[in-house]
Swiss-Prot record:
This is Wings apart-like protein 1. GO terms for cellular component: chromosome; nucleus. Its main location: nucleus. It comes from Arabidopsis thaliana (Mouse-ear cress). It comes from the Eukaryota. Pfam families: WAPL. One of its GO terms (biological process) is cell division. Residues 554-566 have a biased composition (Polar residues). Residues 540-566 are annotated as: Disordered. Residues 854-909 form the WAPL domain. Interacts with the cohesin complex throughout the cell cycle. InterPro entries: ARM-like, ARM-type_fold, WAPL, WAPL_C. Belongs to the WAPL family.
Length: 930
């Protein structure tokens, strides 16, 4: 508290000087014959009319009639010619009638304040730079100025509040300058996070031109503190996510800043080192405190930043509040890498337009993804993908998660980072041939592979591992009886961490500013796919940890999607759906890449004395007895539910799944002998089942779907991409995905009759879920791209065989791909044309509308499967006859009506390229011939 005795004409100037020196202040002013009153934030208090007039006069002298946002120098107050006596006499003059402030249009409380004032606000150092703006000359006072004085008072009141908001930002920006202590930097970033929390506040900052100043200050920060990095990344994303700064986002300084955020933070740990008196004295002079210690990350300033980051991302609808996380420290989304990848993903989304005359698709808007490739951004994202790939390989190898990794949700963080990277690749390859070619030309050695691996091989390997994990139901808790229990117990943890460091890329310092770039974009021949997704963890990941998630939230990732059964196919993404009760889900033990830098962030750790000499002794860091009892009760209830869940498992289904997995393992092992780059994902199922983590299943499914769409974009009208995917056994991998994730097509009554009689007219009325439909259409679209212009791929797909398990035999057998594709076509061959003629319904009939939607979805699958069979039939006479054997009346003419509707639909929308139209018309004529 500061007690000041000043004259009236000096009070405002002194107040501004005091605000530059103190964070928290209350100013009490002693004036002759005037009672003590509080002067706070230039607001009026309507209790004493004499004081009101005095304060309003001072406000007019300070701010005058200048517009908001125009700075005013301190010399303006010193050079005023009107003295204190003149103001006092004018305020007490009998010529001026008393003003009834209750009748004013608004008061200081009624005026719209865009955000609450923060105690951590100050003026920027250069605020009075250039001498400020000279305000207009003061008019000569006279007795007839009462109305004008009232108008000035209202304007000054409004302008004062606007200046208050600007002062908050300026004060926070002042704390971001070099030379300030770390706690001041964190406090300033926390204040800016609260200021930018809502959309209307960010719009106000943009209108006043303040948002650019905030971004400029963030771009020059030294990224050596994890909480500060998270706050800076979140502010950058929030202020640039509206898409109005496309050209600014394309600047090298913005892209390099995002790339720096993807690099690991090098922090020298002080754990285990005694802190002597010299260290304590040094901490008083320099910014050396426990906040830089990666183990002591549960200090109040870090927790405050985490809570504000979560609030801002929730307001931006990038994540949801989730009660399952006890604190913000356990949220896997609150990561610097994740927020940086989120900003890249949003900036890579392309705006497209359709040319009415030519029917072509054109990209409009900025060239962020092209600049990202040129400056090395795509290469940096690829490094994160490789780190996530190494993490998943260790999950497969060790088959266990440590207790701490499970507690900190590090496996979810890796999947979220991977998802965000895949989304960037999908958006970057959309309508960008340069980015596609850059990814297709990528080759790099991974830690677990002796030879160089291409991006196509890397993506297919990721798909295989994700598929295996998804079919097993996610992850299991560590088991002491496991072969690798020594890892989860920490017995051999250091050696594992050392191996992890060797596998991953070397640590790159934050100051690095040289990178190379990659790009990519998503378009499909019969369909163009693009998807923008979003989700949200403080960057505790080591060099090998990284990953990502369109609009995904903490508990249930959500995705925006557009479904078009045509040349332009929107995002076929969705959340995970149950794949049927015939698959008993078992859990897979996994191991993470290594302990994160700040792994113990969420643990209770009381600060040491040397952390902050002015800090309070926070003895309540440890959980209370009541909290411990509550946690124990929750654990016991969870264990009871877990036991009931185990007892309710269907043993016969488990045996079926075990048989299928064992046979699948044998086949994949034979594939590994021929290719060292194929990664087997069909691991032996764990014999101890656990509660299924639905959030993990959603992440696994979204990653799997997005990876397939990345390959679909790389093969769209790209001969090199089609050859690469085909040469890396991509066709066989997609065939296995269909057989394993859609067993209904191989186990249905229709498929059994097809094997016996060669054809069947009976169809099983089974609708796919939204998630199954998205995944199946993406796979079929990729297969269409692969076989449309490549005869070698057509022969490979026609001769491919997939492992299937018949329920009655409980054993695995090989099945050719052509019967499976015919089963998909006939199962989804709806009677839409007959229903269209005989059935009429209104929009009020909800059931009829839903039925029509399901029929439309079946028509999409029917069209793509028919197009795929038609392309295969043009390769050779033997393949053509094989397809006929599984169609009714051994005639390909059944495909013609479906293909004609497909072409007519696209012609109506004028969305089919001439090359595609010519190719489809050619296969239609081929199907008409006997």
């Amino acid at each position: 508290m500061i007690i000041v005795k000043l004259t009236a004409n000096r009070i405002c100037c002194s107040l501004l000087q005091l605000r530059r020196s103190y964070e928290h202040f209350y100013i009490f002013v002693f004036l002759p014959e005037i009672p003590l009153f509080r002067f706070s934030h230039l607001k009026l208090f309507p209790k004493n009319l004499q004081i009101q007039r005095l304060v309003s006069a001072m406000m007019e002298r300070t701010y005058g009639r200048r517009k908001p946002g125009i700075p005013r120098t301190l010399s303006d107050s010193l050079n005023d010619s009107v003295s204190q006596t003149e103001y006092l006499s004018s305020s007490s003059s009998p010529d001026i009638e008393p003003i009834d402030y209750s009748l004013l249009p608004f008061s200081s409380q009624e005026s719209s304040s865009l955000w609450h004032s923060s105690s951590r606000s100050n003026f920027r150092e250069d605020y009075p730079q250039n001498g400020g703006v000279v305000r207009r000359a003061k008019r000569v006072r006279n007795g007839a100025e009462a109305a004008a004085f009232t108008s000035t008072l209202l304007e000054a009141q409004e302008f004062g509040e606007l200046m208050e908001h600007e002062d908050e930002v300026n004060f926070a920006l002042d704390g971001l300058r070099k030379g300030h202590q770390l706690r001041i930097r964190r406090a300033s970033l926390s204040s800016l996070l609260s200021i930018c929390a809502s959309q209307h506040q960010r719009r106000s900052l943009r209108a006043q031109g303040i948002s650019q100043s905030i971004i400029d200050a963030i771009l020059v920060l030294s990224l050596d503190d994890i909480p500060s990095n998270l706050a800076a990344a979140t502010l950058f994303f929030a202020l640039t996510a509206d898409g109005q700064d496309e050209h600014f986002m394309e600047s090298p300084k913005c892209i390099k800043f995002l790339i720096k955020l993807l690099k690991p933070v090098i922090v020298t740990s002080t754990e285990g080192k005694p802190r002597n008196i010299g260290f304590k004295l040094l901490s008083l002079l320099k910014d050396v405190d426990a906040a830089r210690d990666p183990v002591k990350m549960d200090d109040p300033s870090s927790s405050d930043i985490l809570s504000r980051v979560q609030e801002l991302l929730v307001n931006c609808k990038e994540m949801r509040l989730n009660d399952s996380y006890i604190t913000e420290t356990t949220r896997p989304e609150l990561s610097t890498k994740w927020v940086a990848l989120l900003a890249m993903e949003r900036a890579c989304v392309s705006k497209i337009s359709f040319d009415d005359t030519s029917g072509s698709v054109k990209k409009t808007g900025g060239n962020f993804k092209e600049k990202l490739r040129e400056l090395g951004g795509l290469d940096a994202v690829l490094e994160v993908v490789m780190d996530c790939h190494a993490v998943m390989e260790r999950w497969v190898e060790y088959d266990a998660l440590s207790v701490q990794e499970k507690k900190d949700n590090l496996h979810k963080q890796s999947l979220m980072l991977l998802l965000k990277c895949l989304k960037i690749m999908e958006n970057a390859t959309f309508l960008s041939t340069d980015n596609q070619n850059h990814l297709l030309g990528f080759k790099k050695c991974l830690g677990s592979h002796d030879s160089r691996m291409s991006f196509t091989e890397l993506t297919i390997s990721v798909i295989k591992m994700l598929s295996g994990l998804h079919l097993r139901g996610g992850f299991s808790s560590p088991n002491t009886n496991n072969v690798n229990s020594h890892y989860s117990n920490g017995g051999n943890h250091d050696s594992v961490l050392e191996a992890n460091r060797k596998v991953t890329n070397e640590v790159v310092t934050i100051s690095s500013d040289t990178y190379s770039t990659v790009g990519s974009i998503s378009t499909r021949n019969g369909s163009v796919s693009q998807r923008s997704q979003s989700i949200i963890h403080l960057d505790f990941s080591p060099t090998s940890m990284s990953g990502s998630q369109s609009s995904v939230s903490g508990n249930e990732p959500t995705t925006s999607k557009t479904r078009v059964g045509s040349t332009i196919s929107g995002s076929f993404a969705g959340r995970l759906a149950s794949l049927g009760s015939d698959i008993a889900r078992t859990t897979l033990r996994t191991t993470q890449a290594g302990e994160p830098i700040c792994k113990k962030f969420g643990e209770f750790a009381p600060p040491e004395e040397s952390e902050d000499p002015f800090a309070f002794d926070l003895e309540d860091y440890k959980p209370s007895k009541w909290a411990v009892v509550s946690v124990n009760q929750k654990k016991s209830r969870a264990q009871k539910k877990k036991g009931c869940y185990k007892q309710s498992k269907d043993e016969s289904l488990y045996q079926l799944f075990s048989s299928q997995e064992e046979s699948s393992n044998h086949r994949l092992n034979s594939q590994e002998e021929s290719s060292n780059r194929d990664c087997s994902t069909s691991l032996q199922p764990s014999h101890c089942t656990n509660d299924i983590d639905e959030e993990c299943l959603c992440l696994l499914f979204d990653c799997l779907l997005t990876a397939v769409k990345v390959l679909m974009n790389l093969t769209n009208d790209n001969v090199v991409g089609c050859r690469q995917v085909g040469g890396c056994r991509g066709l066989e991998s997609m065939a296995e995905l269909i057989a394993r994730h859609f067993p209904s097509f191989t186990r249905s009554q229709l498929f059994s009759e097809m094997e016996k009689t060669g054809s069947s007219h009976q169809k099983k009325d089974k609708y796919l879920t939204d998630q199954e439909l998205d995944f199946l259409v993406a796979i079929l679209g990729l297969l269409v791209n692969l076989v449309e212009r490549d005869g070698v791929n057509r022969s490979r797909l026609a001769s491919a065989s997939v492992p299937i398990t018949k329920p009655e035999e409980l054993q695995e057998s090989e099945q050719e791909m052509i019967p499976l594709l015919c089963s998909i076509f006939l199962t989804n061959q709806g009677s839409a044309e007959t229903k269209e003629e005989t059935t009429t319904f209104t929009l009020d009939d909800e059931e009829a509308v839903l039925e029509g939607e399901k029929e439309a979805e079946k028509m999409i699958v029917e069209a793509y499967s028919a197009l795929l069979l038609a392309f295969l039939s043009t390769e050779s006479r033997s393949i053509r006859n094989s397809i006929k054997d599984y169609l009714p009346k051994r005639n390909l003419a059944i495909l013609v009506p479906v293909l004609e509707r497909f072409v007519a639909f696209h012609m109506t929308l004028n969305m089919i390229p001439p090359e595609t139209h010519k190719a489809v018309m050619g296969v239609i004529e081929s199907c008409k011939s006997p």
